[in-house]
């Protein structure tokens, strides 16, 4: 299979780099790459949001602030490259065609953000579409898709299996609320829908066992076209 992994920045670097987690997922990714083609997109997480918030003091320019976030995602990506060692391409990939070339070299391409205006969730969905990936695995700080925000509603129900259309609906509803955000943003959900991409959305606990996740053994949500 060809698999794209979307690793959330808040999972990789919650406050400081989670070194043990980075070691664990690097081990899992190397093991998976022995039998599958693998590409990874890394997010910016809380660190990126802190920098963007600070930048608001100095500039109203949203595109400029997006670029700050992109640089943070690439710093996080470099951490994972270091952990993967020789198995990873040694530089952060910045376009999809290069990611394709790196896969042909039997290396793992690692990406961060690419352009202002969309998140690394969207980058991973577009990359999966471009590569015609068999599977997209989204690792986030929530252990799946819920019918409402589990961080605010203790009665929220996790959805084991949904369609891309349902994912779009849930993501758009989450973003319509003040300060709201879903486990996958609406633009990424629309790309998943457009590309008809089979997607697993899992939490950090499952991510320690990515080898099992790609075989369908996880407690997250399956998005099935």
UniProtKB/Swiss-Prot annotation:
GO terms for cellular component: cytoplasm
Primary role: Catalyzes the reversible phosphorylation of UMP to UDP.
Swiss-Prot/TrEMBL catalytic activity: UMP + ATP = UDP + ADP
The entry's keywords: ATP-binding, Cytoplasm, Kinase, Nucleotide-binding, Pyrimidine biosynthesis, Transferase
Family under the similarity heading: Belongs to the UMP kinase family.
Organism name: Thermococcus gammatolerans (strain DSM 15229 / JCM 11827 / EJ3)
Binding locations of UMP: 44, 66, 114-120
Name recorded for this polypeptide: Uridylate kinase
Residues holding ATP: 9-10, 45, 49, 140-141, 146, 149
Alphabetized SUPFAM superfamilies for the sequence: Carbamate kinase-like (SSF53633)
Subcellular location: Cytoplasm
Pfam families, sorted: AA_kinase
Enzyme Commission numbers on file: 2.7.4.22
């Amino acid at each position: 299979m060809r698999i794209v992994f979307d690793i959330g920045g808040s999972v990789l670097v919650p406050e400081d780099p989670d070194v043990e987690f980075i070691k664990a997922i690097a081990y899992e990714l190397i093991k998976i790459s022995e039998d599958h083609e693998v590409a990874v997109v890394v997010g910016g997480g809380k660190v990126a949001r802190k920098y963007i918030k600070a930048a608001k003091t100095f500039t109203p320019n949203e595109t400029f602030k997006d670029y700050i976030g992109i640089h943070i995602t690439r710093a996080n990506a470099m951490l994972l490259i270091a952990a993967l060692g020789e198995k990873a391409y040694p530089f952060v990939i910045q376009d999809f065609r290069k990611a394709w070339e790196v896969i042909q070299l039997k290396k793992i391409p690692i990406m961060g953000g690419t352009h202002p205006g969309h998140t690394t969730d969207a980058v991973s969905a577009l990359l999966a579409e471009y590569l015609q990936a068999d599977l997209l695995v989204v690792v986030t700080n929530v252990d799946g898709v819920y019918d409402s925000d589990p961080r605010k509603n203790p009665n929220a129900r996790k959805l084991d299996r949904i369609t891309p259309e349902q994912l779009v609906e849930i993501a758009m509803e989450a973003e319509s609320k003040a300060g709201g955000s879903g486990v996958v943003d609406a633009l990424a959900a629309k790309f998943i829908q457009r590309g008809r991409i089979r997607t697993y959305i899992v939490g950090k606990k499952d991510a320690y066992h990515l080898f099992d996740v790609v075989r369908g053994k996880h407690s997250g949500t399956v998005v099935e076209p």
